[in-house]
Every structure is written in structure tokens, then in C-alpha cells.
Amino acid sequence: MGEAILIRYEGGVSKAMKTRRVVTGHNKDGRSVVKWDSELESKPGRERFEKVELWATDSLPAHLTEDDPAEWNLGTSLANGSVFRLCRYEPGVAERWHRTDSLDYGIVLSGEMWMELDEQEVHLKAGDIVIQRGTIHNWVNRGTGPCVMAFILIATEGGVSTGW
């Protein structure tokens, strides 16, 4: 993994997670170009948690607009689109049981994470992938260092269903 997702420390205190995001597009002649090349900084959430919104779409299939969705005010997910984000969970992250009306791909990039479900708990390590299908869950970091995860959330039809 690139250094962009590493947690930066100054004097033993963790600083905001910074990620370089490169977005391609087309110029007026239809040639491929870089539209945005910028460093995005994480935003604090609940205690011991922060996230960086990397990209989002407001429809499926996606429309390749000229807008930069990093400026959008996103919630947990979008009703008809997709969200791509990085999240950092420090040890002892505040509990937050939740579910999304989306199909979520979660990738553990570094550290360890415990995913709590109604009936089970799963210990995840760097390289592990979770396919979250609208189930209620909670992320817990019982490790000794931060855990960084990437999430891709894709809107689903009909919301949450039992018996998948």
C-alpha cells in the first residue's frame, strides 16, 4: 500500500489521514487526462474514528459528470448511487451498531478489525475482505494500533431484506 493511507504521527499523536486521489477524464478533444490530482484529508466522526470520502455517484449506472463528489455532503450511503471511502478506526473506537441499504465491499488495508453481527463475531486482518449485504453490524478495533479499511457501497433495490 502507498504511504498516502498510512497514519502520520507527530510527537506520538496521530494526525489526520491524508490520501492522494487521482481522477481521470477527457479533455475537449476526447483525449484522456487527469482531471483532479489532490490530497484529501480525513474528517473526524465519532470518537476514535475518521473517514475520507474518495468518490461517489448519485445514480446506477454512474454518470461521468464533471462534478467532484468529494465536495458533496454524504451520509452513510447514497440512495441510488455508490460511495468509495477510506476509514480509520483507532483502538477503542466508539460503538456504532448500524446497517446500510447497500451492498458494501470492505477491504482491510492495515491493522485488525472485529466485525460484530447479531449472532456472530469475525476477526479480520490486513488483506481480508467483507461483503456486507445490508446486515446490522458494528466495527470494533481490539488491536494495539489503528485499522484502515476501504469501503465501496453500492445502492440496492428494495432496501434491506431478510433471508438473503
Language model regions located:
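Residue-level marker of beta-strand positions
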Residues: 128-129
